[in-house]
Swiss-Prot record:
CDD domains: HisKA. Coiled coil: none annotated. It is an enzyme of class 2 (transferase). The chain crosses the membrane at residues 15-35, 198-218. PROSITE patterns: HIS_KIN. It catalyses: ATP + protein L-histidine = ADP + protein N-phospho-L-histidine. This is Sensor histidine kinase ZraS.
């Protein structure tokens, strides 16, 4: 069953990662297509205007050739510019000489003025191919320009007529033609396209973020589910063990009471210095020890019913240290604790916490033997938890001992039951906390447990 469950969980995790990867890949491809299409649309719109400008320039050159054939020259060119300026989207036409002086303009009032300085014309690198640039003044425009060549082209009859033109016409200075197109509609389309692209990219980003969050929450759900399954299995085992322990305890405690009673009876009726008296006392002590083992076993397997209340850990630690102060003083062991006045109060069972601390103190006292230090510290972690640590200067533990320290019935003491730290771990976990230990031979031991500020019994969470 566990193998099948593990296999199903592994398949679910693998599919979740595969689905997440596919969604992220599709979102990236979709975003790339959006950006590419946006660039293509802008380039297509600009290319359309440029082709329109090229057609108008060739038409103007053709009309000018006809005018030359009919000996109309500049008047015909001016008339053509004024007529063609009425084309949709055209702001103005202009033909200049190589120095930027206007020869013809769609606005006849500007003829003879300077359109651009000669230095600007040189910077434009004007040639036989159409070029373009954006203008912002006096209004947004796309300007297309190239050399104006009305003498080139035409059929055989036109070329024969051009040969008969005067020498000054054929050898005239280079001219440049400019066409300015209104780009307000183009800019509006560009802005709409940009806005749509941003909206689509934001939507893609939301999908990507939602996918990542879904994966995060799914992984969190998987972890919570696994923890719940483990807690349920552990609880079922503890319940079964509890029933067994309760039955065993009932069967053991009754004869133990009889044995202890008989041991005391014989101890009272035998000489104090006799062997029988000593044997009777040993029997009584062993009966007490066995009864204590049974009690600790029941406490370990019985679900804890915590009585939550607002607890000041400073007070709990101080009171628990007072309970072991005489035993520690008799062994020349100093107890160190600095209260934290700003420490927040937590929701916990104070009696159970004292039981945890007393178990840790007594283990530390036993590990030290004589002359040493037990240091207790408490602080807030900043993540909704409080950290409590108990350190001693005892003989420490090996790595093997440290690994088994919370295992029931494992003890480093000859007379220990091996249930103390198991009970400690159980109480801490019932509070929704965790506990761990650090130690090395000759370097003492450090036990640290974390408790949630707003405690809730672990079984209730499940």
């Amino acid at each position: 069953m566990n193998v099948m469950r593990l296999s199903k969980d592994s398949v679910a995790v693998g599919l979740s990662w595969l689905l997440t990867g596919l969604i992220l890949l599709l979102v990236c491809l979709f975003s790339a297509l959006i950006v590419r299409d946006y660039g293509r649309e802008n380039e297509a719109a600009r290319q359309t205007i440029q082709e329109k400008g090229s057609v108008l320039i060739r038409a103007l050159e053709s009309g000018t050739r006809v005018g030359m054939g009919m000996r109309m020259h500049h008047s015909q060119l001016q008339t053509l510019l004024e007529e063609m300026a009425w084309q949709p989207g055209v702001l103005w036409f202009a033909v200049t000489d190589e120095n930027g002086k206007i020869i013809a303009h769609s606005d006849p009032r500007r003829v003879g003025e300077s359109l651009y300085p000669a230095s600007t014309l040189r910077e434009l690198n004007i040639g036989s191919e159409e070029r373009w640039r954006r203008l912002e003044q006096p209004e947004p425009a796309l300007e297309i320009y190239r050399q104006f060549r009305p003498l080139n082209g035409g059929g055989h009859h036109m070329r024969m007529m051009m040969r008969r033109e005067s020498a000054d016409l054929r050898n005239q200075a280079p001219q440049v033609i400019f066409i300015a197109f209104d780009t307000r509609e183009l800019d509006a389309d560009h802005a709409r396209g940009l806005r749509n692209m941003v909206i689509m990219l934001c939507a893609a980003g939301v999908v990507m973020a939602a996918t990542v969050l879904a994966q995060f929450w799914f992984r969190r759900y998987q972890r919570s589910r696994k923890q719940l399954q483990e807690a349920t299995a552990r609880k079922e085992k503890l319940v079964a063990l509890g029933h067994l322990a309760a039955g065993v305890a009932h069967e053991i405690r009754n004869p133990l009471s009889s044995i202890k009673g008989l041991a005391k009876y014989f101890a009272e009726r035998t000489p104090a210095d006799g062997e029988a008296h000593q044997l009777a006392l040993v029997m009584a002590r062993e009966a007490d020890r066995l009864n204590r083992v049974v009690s600790e076993l029941l406490e370990l397997v019985r679900p804890a019913h915590l009585k939550y209340q607002s607890v000041d850990l400073n007070e709990v630690i101080t009171h628990s240290l007072q309970l072991v102060s005489q035993d520690a003083a008799s062994r020349a062991i100093s107890l160190t604790f600095t209260a934290q006045p700003a420490l927040c109060r937590i929701q916990a069972d104070p009696d159970r916490l004292k039981q945890v601390l007393l178990n840790l103190y007594l283990n530390a006292v036993h590990a030290i033997g004589r002359e040493g230090v037990i240091t207790v510290a408490v602080r807030e972690c900043g993540d909704g938890r409080v950290k409590v640590s108990v350190a001693d200067s005892g003989k420490g533990m090996t790595a093997e001992q440290l690994q088994a320290i919370f295992t029931p019935y494992f003890s480093t003491k000859a007379d220990g039951t091996g249930l103390g730290l198991a009970v400690v771990q159980n109480i801490v976990e019932q509070h929704g906390g965790t506990i761990d230990a650090e130690s090395a031979p000759g370097k003492g031991a450090l036990f640290t447990f974390y408790l949630p500020v707003n405690g809730q019994q672990k079984d209730e969470q499940g």
